[in-house]
Structure formats: structure tokens, C-alpha cells
């Protein structure tokens, strides 16, 4: 469990996001793996965030980045005494930019998955959140029950079949909107593309516009993303629908992403994140931005 203007797992909507769109990006990752490891004195670190996946990260009036992740980043960077410079970057350019040395760290509600770990190093998770469907017509999927615990999906098709089959019946013949390149994109395609139309969007806000306008029937994203964004006036007709879906299918949670050779930098952030989890800083920021505890 993190472009909108979006984003979410790379996230993690949950608005967690992931896309390696070109062979060039993969080649760059391979070249990075082969490069010799050299010690580096980290005094300044450039961190890429989308700046459009509220409340994880967003662009404030005046252009400054705010949200859960920028505030957490400021805290952990202070702990390791490193100057962290935040820059806004669309999701699709994050991985290539990291591998090219444009950024040192990615922080965008990126879900940690085995596939991503093949080319990236991840910090320990600083959050873990479930996902949900959203609709404007609760005849399609009933409104989510307040306070209901998340249904845990394992990623095993047989084990997850009862939950997925119930949703397939409700979404048969419908159009589902999903942001491109997220951990949720694969789930939606694998589970529903044979019975529903899947429409992919570059950002979550673009998808939400189509949901409100009736151009799609349902969307899927991180619970924390929707909990914040359905409060906006323009999204007043959107409601969370069906069960919250969590569990191992999304991986251990959201983490920072690094180049493979930067294990020393990862170690610094791991220690700082651990301290922020232990002293309640993460929970405090989560309560502020998500109105719920997302500590892993």
C-alpha cells in the first residue's frame, strides 16, 4: 500500500502503483544490478513522490508537497540527519528516473511485492492498508458495512474464490475503472476481465471523474485513498461498496523503494522507520491523515 494531480503498490491504491513500460527501463535495472557497489556519504537525498495521491501525498497551493508521506519523510530524514529534497514525478517515470539516478528514493504508497523486489530494494513497510470497490449506484455492489473488518485474500485463486466469485456476479457486464501500474491492476485484470470491461487510467482522479459521470460502473483503489477523497464535494456521489479486501495478496505493506546497490541508504531509513513505528509517530500521522491506524 503513493500522478493524480494520483496517483496508491507502484502501490496502495493501497493507492499502491507499478509499471515498467519499456525494455529500456528493464535494461537500466539490469545495468544497475551489475554496477560495482561503492560507499557513499549520504548528506542529501532526492525523493520522488507523485504529489497527487491524497492523503498519502498531494500538492498543496503554492506547489509544496504535503500529506502523510511527506510528513513521515520529514520525520525519518531528521532522525538520520539527511537532507531530503522532495520532487513531484508522475508514476510512470518513477522507476526509470530512479535507475537513471534522477532520484534516490521513491515514496508513493508503493506496495512491496516479490515482482518489484526483483529490481528494487524496499525499506521495511511503514503502512499496510486494504483496498475497496467504489460505486455511485449501490444496486451494483451494496454499500460497505461500517466498521466491518477486511476480508483477507491470500493470492491463491482457490482460497480466494468465494469472495471473488460473489463480486464477479455483481460486476458481470459492468465497466470497472483502475489506475494503471498498481498492485490492484493485476488483481482486477486477473479476476474480472473475462466478465467485465476494464478501463485503465493514468491517474486515480481521472478515473473518479468518469465514475461520477457514469462512464464507468465501479472503481477499485486503496481504502485510505477513498476515505479521504469521497469527502470532496465533487465526489459526493461516490460510496465505498462491498467488503474491504486486505491480506497477503497485497504483500507486507507500503515501503520506500531504492536502487539495488543502495543497501546502505536503505539501512538508514529502515532504522528510522522502525523508530517512528516504535514511538507512535506513524500512528499519529496516520490518525491525522487517514483517520485510522495503518501501522503494519
Regions picked out by a protein language model, each given a short descriptive name:
Residues 74-79, 87-88, 92-106, 119-121, ...:
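Short helices/loops that flank or line small-molecule/ion binding pockets
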Residues 40-110, 118, 279, 292:
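Extracytoplasmic small-molecule ligand-binding "clamshell" domains
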